[in-house]
């Protein structure tokens, strides 16, 4: 089995296992499928942004009751770009939650609105600036971009200015705050949806 075939088999197997675990846990296969699809959408946000930056990226690997992850190597990539890759997952997951919310509202489906609530909640929590979470990766990228010297010197002579890099840090930080606010607004708007 080739490396990519193994990745596809792992994706399918771990997706199915997560689907079964969530379906049994919530007692509804539709909810289980929707929840695992929301996680998949989140991970494909990372994949699309990583590929947009020319990186090789793995297919998602699901971990039942925890989530999923993708791997990529970002050596040489500007820190603000790695921050964007980190934020792309919660952004895509938030869009998926909005779609579930719209469908749930249109069809008066409590389980879809509850699915949207959990999508907003988990993506918002994932933005906490902590360690391995996406928020931690974004925060590190912003801080590392900002902390680079604004002017680089060689032998006492200024040779390069990185003001554009610092402006990127500000732009990514604004995106971070706006995304977090949007996800929290989604949590608050759907929190009384009740169990399905």
Where are these regions (language model features)?
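Hydrophobic transmembrane alpha-helices and their immediate loop junctions
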Residues: 1-196
């Amino acid at each position: 089995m080739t490396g990519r075939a193994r990745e596809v088999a792992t994706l399918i197997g771990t997706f199915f296992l997560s689907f079964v675990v969530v379906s049994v846990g919530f007692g509804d296969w539709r909810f289980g499928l929707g929840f695992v699809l929301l996680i998949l959408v989140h991970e494909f946000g990372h994949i699309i942004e990583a590929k947009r930056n020319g990186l090789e990226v793995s297919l998602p690997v699901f971990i039942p009751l925890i989530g999923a992850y993708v791997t990529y190597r970002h050596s040489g990539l500007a820190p603000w770009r790695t921050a964007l890759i980190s934020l792309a997952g919660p952004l895509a997951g938030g869009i998926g939650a909005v779609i579930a919310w719209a469908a749930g509202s249109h069809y008066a489906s409590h389980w879809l609105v509850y699915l949207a609530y959990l999508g907003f909640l988990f993506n918002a929590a994932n933005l906490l600036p902590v360690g391995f979470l996406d928020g931690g990766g974004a925060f590190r990228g912003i801080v590392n971009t900002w902390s680079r010297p604004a002017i680089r010197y060689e032998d006492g002579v200024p040779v390069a200015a990185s003001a554009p890099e610092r402006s990127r840090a500000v732009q990514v930080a604004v995106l971070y705050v706006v995304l977090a606010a949007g996800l929290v607004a989604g949590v608050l708007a759907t929190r009384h949806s009740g169990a399905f």
